[in-house]
């Protein structure tokens, strides 16, 4: 055998033996960890937005008007027009892929308007986190997309296509109309994140929790 061919053969054998070691050194993240990470991200973001909503309400919306305003806020929510499950029981009737697609749809509908949060609310109002909400949304979006790739075997199948998004938050806080608009948007944001969190928890529970899913 020629010296050059002998060297190539030895290198091929070496790389073949090294392959399993490299794979063991950099294992793929288990599906359970992907779900756990996505659920934690959704819970954190949902709580952040819920706190922001409460603080905005306390600061700008008179208590006597809150009930009447809240009863009409559903009209603001574009997500009410899509066939997404409205609660845990309905979510349990859908497949994991369906729930992931709905979750992604809800998250992506807020990517554009959320970029205006830091222009609307002072840091003290949202506990210095308004600039990070967009980043947290993107992190959650990536987590959901990673789950979809795992469950769909890496294929990019067609799903729901988002054609509508929410309006931008209004920066004119001296206007009553703008205040009500922002109040409604925050309410929808909170509701949509609650839905996404619920879907992710339902999926995680029925895959990895043996007892009943109590949440």
From Swiss-Prot:
Keywords: Hormone, Metal-binding, Phosphoprotein, Secreted, Signal, Zinc
Pfam families, A to Z: Hormone_1
GO molecular function, one term: metal ion binding
Modified residues (Phosphoserine): 130
Compartmental location: Secreted
Binding site for Zn(2+): 44, 197
GO CC, one annotated term: extracellular space
Job description of the protein: Plays an important role in growth control. Its major role in stimulating body growth is to stimulate the liver and other tissues to secrete IGF1. It stimulates both the differentiation and proliferation of myoblasts. It also stimulates amino acid uptake and protein synthesis in muscle and other tissues.
PANTHER family hit by this protein: SOMATOTROPIN, SOMATOTROPIN,PROLACTIN
Sequence similarity: Belongs to the somatotropin/prolactin family.
Protein's name according to its UniProt entry: Somatotropin
Gene source species: Monodelphis domestica (Gray short-tailed opossum)
Gene this protein is translated from: GH1
